[in-house]
């Protein structure tokens, strides 16, 4: 079974470089198309408490959050465009996308909507209570996507 479409879910960690290299190598071997994806992590529940908790002050606060997210999106677009250029120089077809929200859910949705054959992502290595309380994007993805998943670890 080949991997014609590979979704590469990156974060801004050092491990992301290894994730990308693994995906490029696979893309070269399989003649795949890559979708390099980054999600600016924002928990929607966190944002929803501000208006009710802070009342009128939340309006100004939400404007600050909006500006900060726009700045992060601009930085992410520039970062992803440079990655796509690198991937294409390595001879692999590549595109990119960026979203804001919960990474696991966006990766799931991207894999489904883009019809990915494989998702490649890293793993922080959380164990025990840390994984339970902080959550694990890789664990969520493994349990919620319909395609194969490659987890890259340190």
UniProtKB/Swiss-Prot annotation:
Q: Name one Pfam family in it.
A: Usp
Top-level division of the source organism's lineage:
Bacteria
Q: Indicate the family of this protein.
A: Belongs to the universal stress protein A family.
Q: What is this protein called?
A: Universal stress protein Sll1388
Q: What is the originating organism of this protein?
A: Synechocystis sp. (strain ATCC 27184 / PCC 6803 / Kazusa)
Q: Give the organism's phylogenetic lineage.
A: Bacteria, Bacillati, Cyanobacteriota, Cyanophyceae, Synechococcales
């Amino acid at each position: 079974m080949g991997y014609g479409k590979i979704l590469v879910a990156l974060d801004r960690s050092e491990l992301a470089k290894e994730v990308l290299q693994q995906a490029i190598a696979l893309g070269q071997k399989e003649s795949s198309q890559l979708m390099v994806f980054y999600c600016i992590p924002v928990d929607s529940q966190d944002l929803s408490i501000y208006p009710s908790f802070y009342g009128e002050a939340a309006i100004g606060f939400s404007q600050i959050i909006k500006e900060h997210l726009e700045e992060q999106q601009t930085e992410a677009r520039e970062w992803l465009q440079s990655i796509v250029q690198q991937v294409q120089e390595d001879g692999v077809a590549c595109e990119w996308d960026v979203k804001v929200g919960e990474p696991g859910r966006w990766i799931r949705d991207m894999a489904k909507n883009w019809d990915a054959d494989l998702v490649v992502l890293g793993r922080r290595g959380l164990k025990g209570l840390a994984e339970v309380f902080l959550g694990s994007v890789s664990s969520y993805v493994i349990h919620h996507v319909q395609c194969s998943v490659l987890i890259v670890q340190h």
